[in-house]
Amino acid sequence: MSKKQFYLVREDMLTDAMQRTLEAKALLSAGKVRKINEAVHRVGLSRSAFYKYKDGIFPFHAIAKERIMTFSINLADRSGTLSQLLNIVADTGANILTINQTIPLQGRANITLSVDTAPIEIDINELFERMEALESVERVELVGSGS
């Protein structure tokens, strides 16, 4: 049996049936519907399409739980910016494992941040949004993850 490959794909790149499968699974897991038939009817998906994709597509946060994630972040070189970023991460309940900051060149520094997301209290996407919302943050990328 061959090893399964996993890919991180942006939502807008998924087919309509895949997106609707995720919606149906969310309805079921939230208890908003009790049966698969109800879920697929509500999102406008055939049962056969649901069964085709249900075991192969997952929200990013479901895969990312209990993982160590490594982010590459470009920060403007201003006093207190790294502290603000670290506070955002710490406020989620995540455990910061390593921090590596380059010497600021031409007004910006690169931060490599490894974070244990097992204790995180919010969705991983929300963490991305909070980090990107900082005025001093120019870019946030997930560069690796593992157990």
Curated annotation (Swiss-Prot):
Residues 70-145 form the ACT domain. It comes from the Bacteria. Gene3D superfamilies: 3.30.70.260. InterPro entries: ACT-like_dom_sf, ACT_dom, UPF0735_ACT_dom-cont. CDD domains: ACT_PheB-BS. This is UPF0735 ACT domain-containing protein ABC1543. Belongs to the UPF0735 family. NCBIfam families: PRK04435.1. It comes from Shouchella clausii (strain KSM-K16).
